[in-house]
Amino acid sequence: GIDLYELSLLEKQGMKLFYTKARCGTCHKPEQNGSGYFTSFANIGLDINYSDPGVGSLSGSSNLNGVFKIPNLKNVALTAPYMHDGRFSTLEQVIDHYNHGIKPNPNLSIELSNLNLETIDSLQNLPSFSTTLTMNGGLTIEPIKLGLSVEEKAALKAFLLTLTDEEITRDIKFSDPF
């Protein structure tokens, strides 16, 4: 039989934060295409000036500078270092980035802007909307400041850890594909 895991109170609080105040669920959405690898693309405000322009280098469009694939969060506890360049070694550092370290940027994905979620939802429903759209006539988009408390950050991390299947670290069939 399958052992079902019941979330603790702390993990449930983290799950609620994931989909509300922390806004994680606006980008890290459940798979829709079944591929399991990436969910979309976004500029998450890592840099103001880019040593790696991401999709912008492939497209030739400066509006896409700083845009990278958004991975799903399956087994997130096992996939450090984090971000396209490995700049964060812990989930705490990632949470801190989203909590107060997002840099203002004209290409910042709207989900991380200081717009409220209702405004974001209404903009995303427009036929011509793109999450990498330069807003405000090219002015820098101000990032959200989540304001997560120490307790909320701990709850969010606790939930993120539930997305990891520890069985793959113990079961020999997953150890060496060659």
Language-model-detected regions and their locations in the chain:
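Periplasmic c-type cytochrome electron-transfer domains
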Residues: 1-178
